[in-house]
Amino acid sequence: MTSIIYSPKDIFEQEFKTSMRGFDKKEVDEFLDNVIKDYENFNAQIEALKAENEALKKAKYQARNTVSATVQQPVPQPTRVAQSATNFDILKRISKLEKEVFGKQIIE
C-alpha cells in the first residue's frame, strides 16, 4: 500500500508562506493535493480492511459450522467387554495387594 504523507498533527501544524495577497496559492494547492492523496489512501485501506473482515467472518462461520457438524456426530461407545476386563484386572491387582499388605501384618 502507499504510504500516508501527513499525520493529523502535520495538517494541524502546517503553516503557509504569505505573499502580497495572502498565502502562496501554489504551496496551498500542493498541500491540499497531498491531503487528497492521503484521503484516497485511507479510503483504499478502509475498503481493503472491510473486504478482509468480511472474508474472516465467512471463514469463522464456516469453521463454526464444521465444528458443529463434527460435534453432532455420535461418539462410538467403548465396548463393554474391554471395560469389564479392565475391572477384572483391577480387582485381581487389589486382591494381590491386600494379600501382601495384610499378610505382612499377620506375620508381624
Curated annotation (Swiss-Prot):
Record-level GO BP terms: cell division; regulation of cell shape
Subcellular location: Cytoplasm
GO CC terms: cytoplasm
Keyword line: Cell cycle, Cell division, Cell shape, Coiled coil, Cytoplasm
Gene3D superfamilies per UniProt: 6.10.250.660
Residue runs in coiled coils: 32-69
Function: Divisome component that associates with the complex late in its assembly, after the Z-ring is formed, and is dependent on DivIC and PBP2B for its recruitment to the divisome. Together with EzrA, is a key component of the system that regulates PBP1 localization during cell cycle progression. Its main role could be the removal of PBP1 from the cell pole after pole maturation is completed. Also contributes to the recruitment of PBP1 to the division complex. Not essential for septum formation.
Similarity remark: Belongs to the GpsB family.
Quaternary assembly: Forms polymers through the coiled coil domains. Interacts with PBP1, MreC and EzrA.
Name recorded for this polypeptide: Cell cycle protein GpsB
Organism: Streptococcus pyogenes serotype M49 (strain NZ131)
Gene this protein is translated from: gpsB
